[in-house]
Amino acid sequence: MAAQGRGRVGGGKEERVSARSDSELLLHPELLSEEFLLLTLEQKNILVKNDVKMDKDGLTDLYIQHAIPLPQRDLPKSRWGKMMEKKRKQNEPKSENKSVTAVGGLRKRPLIVFDGSSTSTSIKVKKTENGATDRLKPPPAGSITNTVRRLSAPSNASTYISASSLSEDAKLEVRNNEAKQNNISKTNSSVLVNLKTHPLSPVAGTTVVKLKRSVPKDESDLPNDLKPTEAKKKIQHCTWP
């Protein structure tokens, strides 16, 4: 039994030594063959030009740049080190599964190919039989009658009347109102003219008071707007009853 136990221990040590030797070989690509280097580069999705025959030196340079494993710190043989080794072993298959699922999801989606013609396409507009575009079509005939228009009404009345509902009687009333307004304005203007030509005469028994404005001595001090002009030489005095 003791011999079998020793044999098992010896076999385990040999396996560990072989695993370490393989990992050490990955850190020294000069010892690897060209075929192995090509396989590792293809697994890492690193393109190698088929036209150009690369030497082993070129493959080793690519391997060192992209595919060489990163250095990792050796864990101590304590309880914490054993726990970290277990976590690493558990995380390795998870990361592989995630990468596989991501690649599968990308493959399920259809590939989008952009052609040169798609960027330089011109905008197409549908044309009618007459050659005019749909945007420039006139409005339908039914909408013209229903439009809202503002009529020339007196200043007091600020209402909107639709052209369709307006009758002839309403039009006549509007015209009569305009004529009345014109007559009122004419009478007001005639009254003002009469007042200017015939000023009010003073009533008997009342005193006439003349209002005088104080004019400065120097006319140069006055502004241009307040200076007397030739047309306004006579000042009309106001008479109070």
UniProtKB/Swiss-Prot annotation:
- UniProt key word Nucleus: yes
This one is known as Ashwin
Q: Where is this region: Disordered?
A: 1-21, 82-102, 212-241
Cleavable signal peptide: none
Q: Which organism is it from?
A: Gallus gallus
User: What is a single cellular component term in the Gene Ontology annotation?
Assistant: nucleus
Assigned keywords, A-Z? Nucleus
In terms of one coarse class, where is the protein primarily found?
nucleus
- Which InterPro entries would you find in this protein's record? Ashwin
Intrachain S-S bonds: none
State its location(s). Nucleus
BP GO terms, sorted: anterior/posterior pattern specification; convergent extension involved in gastrulation; embryonic morphogenesis; regulation of apoptotic process; Spemann organizer formation at the dorsal lip of the blastopore
| Compositionally biased spans, kind Basic and acidic residues | 11-21
Offer one Pfam family short name for this entry. Answer: Ashwin
Q: Which family does it belong to?
A: Belongs to the ashwin family.
